[in-house]
Structures are given as C-alpha cells and as structure tokens.
Amino acid sequence: MEKYVRLQKIGEGSFGKAVLVKSTEDGRHYVIKEINISRMSDKERQESRREVAVLANMKHPNIVQYKESFEENGSLYIVMDYCEGGDLFKRINAQKGALFQEDQILDWFVQICLALKHVHDRKILHRDIKSQNIFLTKDGTVQLGDFGIARVLNSTVELARTCIGTPYYLSPEICENKPYNNKSDIWALGCVLYELCTLKHAFEAGNMKNLVLKIISGSFPPVSPHYSYDLRSLLSQLFKRNPRDRPSVNSILEKGFIAKRIEKFLSPQLIAEEFCLKTLSKFGPQPLPGKRPASGQGVSSFVPAQKITKPAAKYGVPLTYKKYGDKKLLEKKPPPKHKQAHQIPVKKMNSGEERKKMSEEAAKKRRLEFIEKEKKQKDQIRFLKAEQMKRQEKQRLERINRAREQGWRNVLRAGGSGEVKASFFGIGGAVSPSPCSPRGQYEHYHAIFDQMQRLRAEDNEARWKGGIYGRWLPERQKGHLAVERANQVEEFLQRKREAMQNKARAEGHVVYLARLRQIRLQNFNERQQIKAKLRGENKEADGTKGQEATEETDMRLKKMESLKAQTNARAAVLKEQLERKRKEAYEREKKVWEEHLVARVKSSDVPLPLELLETGGSPSKQQVKPVISVTSALKEVGLDGSLTDTQEEEMEKSNSAISSKREILRRLNENLKAQEDEKEKQHHSGSCETVGHKDEREYETENAISSDRKKWEMGGQLVIPLDAVTLDTSFSATEKHTVGEVIKLDSNGSPRKVWGKNPTDSVLKILGEAELQLQTELLENTSFKSEVYAEEENYKPLLTEEENLQCISKEINPSATVDSTETKSPKFTEVSPQMSEGNVEEPDDLETEVLQEPSSTHTDGSLPPVLNDVWTREKEAAKETELEDKVAVQQSEVCEDRIPGNVDQSCKDQRDPAVDDSPQSGCDVEKSVQPESIFQKVVHSKDLNLVQAVHCSPEEPIPIRSHSDSPPKTKSKNSLLIGLSTGLFDANNPKMLRTCSLPDLSKLFRTLMDVPTVGDVHQDSLEIDELEDEPIKEGPSDSEDTVFEETDTDLQELQASMEQLLREQPGDEYSEEEESVLKSSDVEQTARGTDAPDEEDNPSSESALNEEWHSDNSDAETTSECEYDSVFNHLEELRLHLEQEMGFEKFFEVYEKVKAIHEDEDENIEICSTIVENILGNEHQHLYAKILHLVMADGAYQEDNDE
C-alpha cells in the first residue's frame, strides 16, 4: 500500500471495501478492493491467490483491467483500473423514467456479452452480474467488473451479504439451492437487459420470501412493444426457468442483430482471437464477405485470420483479395441464402466444366446451360419454400414470445428455438465443409442476396425467368394470401385459448389455496391429537419417571382418601355437637318462652314492647337501630309462602302450653291494637330507610294486620304479633340460623326458586343454597369492620373448642377475620352465591370460589351499615349454632358434591406456601376465607381463571411441579381463532413440521446423532413453548404442558426402521461425489478439530464446488439427476450441520430472524447481515451464508413448485 495514496472510499459490497487511490509511480487513479481473508484456512488462501492470478491475466477491452494484488494485515488487496463514468446502475437512475434507445441498449448489451464470453470461455463463472458491477469509461465503453471474486469469497460471509444486498439477480436454481452454473450468469444477464429496457427490476417484491417465489415462477411484466421483437424474444429466452433452455453467451452472440454490432467494439485481431478460440474452423473461410463494399460490418475483419489459422496450409489454395472476383461472389452467394451448403462444391465444379466445354464445343455448353437452368429453378422453388418456412417459424416464435411475456409457461412447445439454431448452424463458408458458421453472417447479408438476385434476373436469367418464374408467381401469391389468413385465424384462436387458460389457472389457484389450507389444518389437528395422546400416556421408555409418577399418584390418592376420611369424621363430630347445642338452645328457649307468657299474663296492663325490651338482651342497640320484622325479611328471599308451614312445625315442637294460651294472646292483641299500630308505623318508617323498594308491601301488611291475624286464627295456629316484636322473640326456633344482614332483592331479577318443606332445613342452609342476586354480594366491607372486632371476643371460647379438631391453620394471618366472625361478616355472603353458582356446572371447593370472587365483586355504598344489629339477648348461643350450622353446610357440600382429588386444584398456583405446608389446610373450616395476601395475589383475568378451573385435572397434586401427568390444557380461544384466520398453524413451533409437504429429517438426524435427553430438550425449548401455549403473559407457567414426550410405539418403530435404513444404505441418500465430499470434509474436521464449512462453500477442491456447467445441447454434459433428487438431502444435511455446530437454540433464533426479515415488507433487508452477525458473534459468523441459503431454499420449496 505504500505505492498508493488513499483518496476516498467509493463503495462497499460483496468484496468488502473499495477505495479510490492514486499511484505514486504513474500518477493514475486506481481502485483497490480490500477483502478480508483472515477467516480463511491456509488452503483456501492459496486457492484465492491462484484465482486472483487467473483474473489478473485476463485482458479484454470490456473487462475492468486488474493491475496487481497483494496481501497485508490479513486482507487481500486487488488493484484495478478506475472507471470514471460510474456504473450502469447510476446511469439507469439518471434517466428518471425516460427509456433508453434500442441501439444504445444493444450496444451496451453486446459489450457485456463479449466480456462474459471471454470469462466463460475460460471456464470461469462471474457469479455476481448486476448493474452495479458494470462500469462505464469516459468514452462510453462498458466494462465488466468484480467477476470471479464471488468464487474467491465462496467461504466467507461477504457472499451472503451480496445475496442480501442484490437479491433481484438470483436465478431459480440458486433460490432452490441447486448448483451454480454458467446459465445462472445468463439469467443475471437477462435481469440486466430487462433493467436497461424498463429501468426496473424484472422481479420485485415486498419481502424476500415473495421475491424468491416470483423468481421461481419466472413471471415478469412484459417489456414495452416499443422495442423490437428480436430484443423481446431474446429477453424471454434468457428468463427460461430451466437452465438448459437458456442460450449460452456464444449462442447469444451468434444472433444476427447482435453479431453485426461486434465489429464496432472489437478490433479484427481480437475478433479472430475471441471467436477462433472455441472453434478455429468457424472463421477460417470468412474473408469472403469482407470484400463486399455494401456490408460495412465487422465480418470483413476476419481477413487477418489468415496469419493465425493458415488457411493455405489447410485448403491448398492461397486466400488473397484478387482470387475472388465479383462473378464468383455472385455464384457463391445464393447457396448460403438457400441453406444448401452441401451443393456449393457442385456448383463450383459445374462452372469450371462449363468454361472448359465452352472453349471446346458449343453443343456441350448448351447442354450444361440447360442443366444449370433446371438447377436454378429448383433452387428458386426451395428458396420460396424456405422463405415460407422461415416466416411461419417467425410467427410461431412471436406467438410463443407473447405468451411467455404474459407469464403462461404451458403454452410453449418443445424445441422452442432449436430449429432456428439448427438452420443457422447449417451455414458454412464457401470453402469450409464445417456446418458451424455464425448465424449472424447469414442474416446480415439478406439485403445483399436480394440485390444480387435482382441483378441476376435482369442480366443472366431473363430468358428462363420469364417462362418459369412467371408461371409460378400467381399460384405463389394465392398461397401467401391463404397462409396469411390461416395465420390470422390461428393467432385469434391462440389468444382465445390463452384467455381460457388464464381463467382456468385463476380457478386452479383458488382450488390450490383451499387445498393448502385444508392440508395445514389437517396437519395442525393431527399434531394436536398426537401431542394430547403423548401427553396423556405414561412414558414407557423412561422407567424411572414412570415409577415416580405412579408413586406420586398413589400418594395423592392415599392423601385424598385420608383427607376425605378426616372431613367425614369432622362433619360427623360437628353434626353431633350441632344437634346437642340445638337441643340445649331449644330447652332454654322453651323455658324463656314459658316465663315470658306467664309474665305477659300477670302484667297485661303493661305495654308489650317494654316487656320485650326488658327480656330482649340488648336494649341500647335496639333503641339506636330499628328492628327488622322477620315477615319482611322472609318475603324478600321468597319464603313468604313457606313461612306459615315452617312456623307451624316449629310451634308444634315447642310446647303444648302454647296452644292453651291462644285465647289469652288474641285478647291481648285486641286490647293493645292501638299501641301496636303506633309502634308498627315506627317500624315501617325504619324499614323504608333501609330497603326502599319494600315500603308499599310493608304498609299493606301493617294496615291489614287484623285480617292477617284472622287468617292465622282460621288455620288454627298460634297468632303472634310478628311485625311488632323482635326477631329473637317472634322466631326463636330459627334465630340460630339467621344471617346478620338484610337480603335485598332485585326487582328486575328472575323469581327465586321455592324451597322445599323440610322441617330439618335451617334458614342459614337454605339461604346458603339459594341463588342470590348481585345486590347481596355488593356489600361494603368497611361497614362491618367495627362490628366484627367488637364481637370478636364473644367467639374466642368457640375457637378454643374447635382447636382440638385442628380446623384452624396456624399459618393463617390473624389479622384476617376467621370463620367465627362469618356469621355477620359480608365475606360469607360472598361465599354463598359463588358456591351455588359454581355447583351449577361443576362442583368445586369453597377456596377456589373465594379466590375468584374479588375479580367480580364490587362495593355497593347504597346499603347503610345500620342493618347489622339483629342480635338478641341469646347472642352467644345463636352465634355458636350459626357457626356450627355453616360448618355443617360446607362439610356436607364437600362430602356430597366435591370430586375426590379436587382439593386445592384450581388455586394451587395462587396459594400461600404456608397454607400448603399445613397437612389439613386443604379441608379446613377456614378455607372459605383466605388471608389478605392471597386476595392481593390474584392478578389473573376472569377468563383465564375460568379456563384453569375447567381444565384442571382431578389427579393434579397440591405442590407445583414442573412435569405433569394431567391432560393438556386447550389453547385460548383467541389464539386458536388467530391461527385459523391466518393459516399459520405451525409457524412458531420449532417442533412442528417445517413445511407443508416435506418431512423434517433434521429431527430424525437429531434423534439418532445428538441424542439429547428428554429433560434437556424440554429445558432448552421451554421458553419457546411457553410463548406458544400461553398467550397471557401474566398467567402461570405452562411448562408442564410442553414437556417433550417420547413417541408412541408406532413412531418408535418408524424411527428404528429409518435408523436401520440410514446405517445400511448410505448411498441412497447421497451420490458418490457427495459421499466423497462428506468423507473428505469429515477427515478435515477430524484433523482440525473443528467443523469445516459445507462442501458447497469450500473452494479448495474442485469436486466440492457447488457449480456445474451447462452447454447449449445438454446431451453432451448432462448433469446427473441425483444432484437434483438429493436437493432435499442437501438441505436437511445442511440443517443438521448447522444445528450441531451452533446448537439448536441459537440456530433456530438466527433462522427465525432471517426468515422474519425476509417476510417483512417494511423491513430493510440490507440490515439483515448486521443483525444476524451480532447474534452469531465471531465464533459462528462464517455460518451466516449457509443459514441464508437454507432460509431461501425452504421458502422456495414451501410453495407450489413444479420443477
């Protein structure tokens, strides 16, 4: 670098950096391209040096000249000439939509073809033809640059950056990961020509995936008809999907409208060197056309070829200018025009004999003249036929080209351009017997041949032309008209068929999309079924885990049985205590009632409310807060119809003394009617303040109290002023079961169910089983706070009694109100409706319902806290009985309705660890009330809780485990709908099928070779599976549902058979060449201790290059079909190597990132390499090219691809 002075950086591309420098020796400007080869091995560096040496020896006016190359600081520097005119890409952008002239396009294209021919003739591939690599000099000469560099950089990451930066020039075989060949350069050449004609890329798409699909389909917008048919036809040939159908660069240069421009850009000596390099016999006889003054084209430049080919030594006749006169030219011209090369020597012999015989005798001359006339006549007939055939062939090619431009691939018939090519190959020189002269020489002299034909008709053939040619002309004209009409009809029918095919193709696309969606949906359903089946079965292959699971199941069953037995024992004990306390309370009430009746009889003149207040227990509270009549309360909950019956049964059990006092009570009621009316009004006003919508019914009840009393008298029952007395006095038998709040009924709600007439049912139990409206749940907790703490001391003895039953967990926070306060706390009101609602569909424990309640509970400030005090003087006894009654209700529901094993199932992820540690907390009395921390911990949405409650397994254990034997949880409905609407059933799960139609053999290789344990695979892919199976991020982990399960028996047998097949028949998967490459790569890996690059990226051996060569006639160098058949094997093998070298997680991350960028229409694909290199790091940066090829090939084979 000391010989050059850096001026500025002018670009960066596949090669690395390009720097403009100035030479200190000659002062000229050069471009130095810096290539980083530090990552290459020594062998690859040697190969790179040889390649650069070959490139430096190429000298051609249309190729950027290499001056020298050297290495410094781990980089390869290539010095080449500087083109001041910029590149063709900038020139196209400078047009700003104005199309180029066809002559300008063809001039540039011919120069590009000449440069590419120079490269291809030396069996070197360019591999990076694009408008940015085609440069313009000051005088407008086109020079091709950067050729061969992609071959040098075959194993570096820069090649991958090239593919990302300029994906518009990729050929279908590259997208399909097939070997690169010379026809891939032809495809890129067609892309450049299309860009010159339209100023746009032939294949454009919003993302890489769609671009690859467009390239594979081979459909491109048609070129403007402003350009000639020859140019459009050439373009369609360059864009053939099959590489063997594309012409070679030599065939392109043989076309007439291309060949006539060669002379403008190459000197005669260069033309001779370039075109004689391949076949010397082609251009040996070509000085003949050079003498014609009318041609003015480059064919006359073949005269200097005498010095190189030495035609005198070959043909025995010196080729000089004076040897060929105008007369001989006239004789030699028509045969090549008539395509009768084999008759040229015969004509020549006939003319020599004619001259000899004319000098000898006139008779012989006349006979020869007659023979010559006959031959000329036949030649003319053949010429006319040839013209007609050529016209028909041209029309046919034009129709094919139109169909090709419209994108219909099925219209083409076999051998599209073979006939034309063959006809031109049949042309040879006048002296040479070779049938391989260039097509361009014949077509260029059509005008000269016609002029000579006219001169011959006027001078030498006037006699026989008038007789014979005149006789054939009318018939010939009629034939032409008929052929033209037939061609027009055929063209119309052809266009009609094309329209029908277009319509049928559109219908076929719709059918295909429907079938593809069905296939994807079927695959998705099958995977879900297999996943559910695998998750639900025991793991046969893993004996230890199976045994542990069985032991855990047995332990859970035993634990549940013991819990159930304990629950039943507790329920029995509590029932016995409840019965005993009920009897004691009943006896106490009986005695109190008798004393009360005696006192009322003795002091009948004393007002009844005062007597009741003296015996009521809590006068101060009754003075402050109004008394709620039990009639009004029971009517509100729908018990007004059954109240009388219940009262009858309770009164019959109370005492026979009650019936004997009925008359006395009736007289007392009549005497105290005025006082009762006054008192009733006060109670009525108090009730209206609390429950506003009951005013009218209360008022009617109080006004019609006398008639109501009569109704009770007619029934033969005890008549008691229930509306005027307190709750404990009027209904002492049921005071043990009364809940301490007013039940407010929604006026618009559905009517309540009628309770059965069972004398053993308590009010508390009925209220607990009743289906309450929302108003009963919306009580304000703060309104009861003082009452709860005020009464807390009254229940301490009861808690002491229950401690021997171990019904209170030590770990529960004492600040939370325990079960003894539930008799007047609104939390019990929350439990009851939830419990009844939960039992409608599926029985569950009370703890689950309490945890779900706060998400739907709202406070209602409309209910004042003055309704709490309905306690009687027998407060402690009533509270004890109510507590026991509630416990009995809960325990009976647990025993009767709950499924064994449902203990703590739905809330196992939400429970406090302290509660889980208690062996009996699962069935505790306090299960209906959780500590405050548990209520704060509930952050899940209601839908998620419902899904968890529905899909919880009965065998689920209490502690949280990472592995679960429960059936799988169904995916969220929303995520399923999204998957159905988008069709992406298998896009995000790496364990699913990668494409719709191809098996993922990488999993098979991974199973046979990597053999990771099931647990390891699960831990590695846990995060990915969680993202798929659990759409709600705040929800609990679904890791137990995504355990990588062992396959069932059928899948194991399939894997075993495929493993045996792979071991016994390795030759079936790869061809011999591929096997040798794999073996050699394995040897290199063993020697170096690292994974060598894939064989397609290793330029060190010729057999390992992912290249092949296609000639014009593919018979001579036909590539083995095994290479195409094993494309899938290449892909899966490449996938396997990448997973082994990088690790599955990193490989999958990079793969998905590249795929996402390719599919994102808004993403700039040029930044893909930077992002991916940051993920890969320096260690795996060289693998980017392989990952890119894999992504592109997967996208190519994923959709419909016929070839």
Curated annotation (Swiss-Prot):
It holds the Pfam family Pkinase. Keywords: ATP-binding, Cell cycle, Cell division, Cilium biogenesis/degradation, Cytoplasm, Cytoskeleton, Kinase, Magnesium, Metal-binding, Mitosis, Nucleotide-binding, Nucleus, Phosphoprotein, Serine/threonine-protein kinase, Transferase, Tyrosine-protein kinase. SUPFAM superfamilies: Protein kinase-like (PK-like). One of its GO terms (biological process) is response to ionizing radiation. InterPro entries: Kinase-like_dom_sf (IPR011009), NEK_Ser/Thr_kinase_NIMA (IPR051131), Prot_kinase_dom (IPR000719), Protein_kinase_ATP_BS (IPR017441), Ser/Thr_kinase_AS (IPR008271). Its cofactor is Mg(2+). ATP binds at residues 10-18, 33. Residues 674-683 have a biased composition (Basic and acidic residues). It comes from the Eukaryota. Its EC number is 2.7.11.1. The modification Phosphoserine is found at residues 417, 437, 618, 750, 786, 820, 832, 997, 1071. GO terms for cellular component: centrosome; cytoplasm; nucleus. Residues 4-258 form the Protein kinase domain. The active site is at residue 128. Predominantly in testes (germ cells and Sertoli cells). Lower levels in ovary (oocytes and granulosa cells), thymus and lung. The keyword Transmembrane helix does not apply. Phosphorylates serines and threonines, but also appears to possess tyrosine kinase activity. Involved in DNA damage checkpoint control and for proper DNA damage repair. In response to injury that includes DNA damage, NEK1 phosphorylates VDAC1 to limit mitochondrial cell death. May be implicated in the control of meiosis. Involved in cilium assembly. This is Serine/threonine-protein kinase Nek1. The lineage of its organism: Eukaryota, Metazoa, Chordata, Craniata, Vertebrata.
